[in-house]
């Protein structure tokens, strides 16, 4: 990670650098119960997200969707009091005992919400004094697979759930003005 000077570097944490900017805060958000119902072209810069919800990031969308009446706007939070929630032995089974490769019973919450999709959108500006710097975007723990687009262009993807994902976004940025 880059620091502007020795004083910043001695503080060690990235957020102490003037080359660090957090994108935590309010984002536009759309939830879909499955991939077929997701907004397919939302990465386009002209896509209208004005009717999408506002959601504070970072957050679990399932928890953010809890309503006062007890219903959930964004799927159901899934709690497991077991260390491993997926089957990790490959043995033939005649009944459902869990497992990532099996279809759960229809009355289970995991049947209804097997592959939810959250689409996020945020605008930001690059500080003028970052001119000439490489700019990286870090995601510190997305819960699943995701694609990243900047200004309508595909940047990359990550499938490492809850791990750091880092992207060099320098070539995709508008250095003067807003980025989507």
Spans of features found by a protein language model:
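Accessory carbohydrate-binding/adhesion or oligomerization-edge regions at the termini
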Residues: 1-99, 155
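Accessory beta-strand-rich segments of carbohydrate-active enzymes
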Residues: 13-14, 30-32, 38, 63-64, ...
């Amino acid at each position: 990670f880059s620091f502007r000077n020795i004083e910043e570097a001695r503080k060690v944490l990235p957020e102490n650098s003037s080359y660090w900017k957090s994108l935590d805060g309010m984002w536009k958000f759309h939830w879909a119960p499955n991939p077929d119902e997701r907004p397919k072209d939302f990465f386009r810069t002209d896509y209208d997200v004005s009717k999408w919800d506002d959601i504070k990031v970072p957050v679990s969308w399932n928890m953010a969707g809890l309503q006062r009446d007890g219903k959930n706007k964004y799927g159901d939070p899934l709690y497991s009091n077991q260390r491993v929630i997926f089957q990790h032995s490959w043995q033939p089974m005649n009944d459902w005992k869990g497992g990532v490769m099996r279809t759960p019973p229809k009355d289970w919450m995991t049947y209804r919400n097997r592959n939810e999709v959250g689409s996020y959108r945020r605008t930001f500006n690059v500080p003028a004094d970052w001119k000439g710097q490489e700019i990286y975007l870090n995601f510190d723990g997305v819960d699943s697979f995701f694609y990243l687009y900047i200004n309508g262009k595909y940047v990359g993807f990550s499938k490492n759930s809850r791990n750091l994902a880092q992207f060099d976004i320098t070539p995709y940025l508008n250095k003067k003005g807003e980025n989507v």
